[in-house]
Amino acid sequence: MARTTFQGPLRSLGGIYQQGPATVVEITTSTTLTPEDHGGRIISIGGSLAAALTLTLPTINTSANSTTSGPGQDPSTANNEGVMYTIWVPTTISTSSLKIGTTSGSSDLYVGAVISIDSDTSGAVVAFSANGSSNDFINLNGTTTGGVAGTWVQIVAIAADKYMVSGNVIGSGTVATPFADS
């Protein structure tokens, strides 16, 4: 994603959106996500994974060129506050698992909740929330913790050490929380 160099607020009366083939990024192997390559895009994962796939979120940086630094902010700043990652599972994860974790050694944790839907029997709907104190992984196994086709999770770097999570996690069997400490 290109970085802009304009100064001042951006105003659009017609809205701002991304479109085209680069809007959806397909990932088939473990990857460290970056704001430039994955932020604001739909990350598509699913199907028969060759091995457990881990998406690693970048460490949240709110101190580089903060909002209090005034006009003329550096377009190449390392500050990634507000970057949003949308992970979508178009085909049920069938042979392994998907883990979405924060960078090892960082103090970044999840806050927020996902709605979990039992797709195979009762149609039960349950909300699971991250505990905000130790959960640094979202684990989707294709069954009880989600990862059935149609699952999506949106993750936003909302503040220092906090990734805000929302989404619909579709599972089968007795659904369980996808939030974990590893």
Tell me what each language-model feature is:
Residues M1, L55, L140-T144:
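Short aromatic-glycine motifs in intrinsically disordered, low-complexity regions
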Residues A2, V89, G147-T151:
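Residue-level signal for functionally critical sites in structured catalytic/ligand-binding pockets
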